[in-house]
Amino acid sequence: MELPVRLVVGLGNPGEKYASTRHNVGFDWLDRLASSQRVAFTLETRFRGLCARIMLADTDIWLLKPQTYMNASGMSVAAVCRYYKIVPEQMLVVHDELDLQPGVIKLKSGGGTGGHNGLKSIVADLSSQVFWRLRIGVGHPGDRNQVVDYVLHPPRREEAALIDEAIDHSMQVWPLIARGDFAAAMQRLHTRQEN
């Protein structure tokens, strides 16, 4: 078993303009988790983000939706980590993933940023790549010149349904992730998608 999770970061952009876009699936995932735990987000100006707290086995787990816009997410994440003395290995970042098809979710530790500006910002501000990522597939437009426009638009109805279903499944795996049983979480999460 790894270290239990103490911080879950959902990546996205603030404001109605970006709500329901592919780039905001990290926010959507975190909203679903907060709703299931019956907690609400409040603005914490010192962290430049919307925060909530849940408890699991007498451990505080902080939920964070940075309000800095994607490219500066690391500033918000680093502030929370410093304040609560959370090391990167105790953090899960939930984000959109172009390299996975809609409906596919993968859990992994460390690795590169895959060109994701939110991840780049977090890596730069924490000086570490060693944190857990829950990668939610949104598909790829097929042309890298169309990526920015693609992620800043909502998924098509059938893609949204697949993403929703995958998020629902990942919520069933959440307790394993939270307590640091990542091997079991990956097995359950990834096996379902191979059938």
From Swiss-Prot:
SUPFAM superfamilies associated with the record: Peptidyl-tRNA hydrolase-like
Catalysed reaction, written as an equation: an N-acyl-L-alpha-aminoacyl-tRNA + H2O = an N-acyl-L-amino acid + a tRNA + H(+)
Subunit-structure text: Monomer.
One of the protein's GO biological processes: protein quality control for misfolded or incompletely synthesized proteins
PROSITE patterns per record: PEPT_TRNA_HYDROL_2
Site (Stabilizes the basic form of H active site to accept a proton): 96
Cited CDD domains: PTH (cd00462)
Annotated positions for site Discriminates between blocked and unblocked aminoacyl-tRNA: 13
Chain segments annotated as transmembrane: none
Entry's family note: Belongs to the PTH family.
Compartments where located: Cytoplasm
InterPro entries documented for this protein: Pept_tRNA_hydro, Pept_tRNA_hydro_CS, Pept_tRNA_hydro_sf
GO cellular component: cytoplasm
Keywords associated with the record: Cytoplasm, Hydrolase, RNA-binding, tRNA-binding
Function noted in UniProt: Hydrolyzes ribosome-free peptidyl-tRNAs (with 1 or more amino acids incorporated), which drop off the ribosome during protein synthesis, or as a result of ribosome stalling. Catalyzes the release of premature peptidyl moieties from peptidyl-tRNA molecules trapped in stalled 50S ribosomal subunits, and thus maintains levels of free tRNAs and 50S ribosomes.
Superkingdom classification of source: Bacteria
Binding site for tRNA: 18, 69, 71, 117
Entry EC no(s): 3.1.1.29
Protein name according to UniProt: Peptidyl-tRNA hydrolase
PANTHER family xrefs: PEPTIDYL-TRNA HYDROLASE
Catalytic residue positions: 23
GO molecular function terms noted in the UniProt entry: peptidyl-tRNA hydrolase activity; tRNA binding
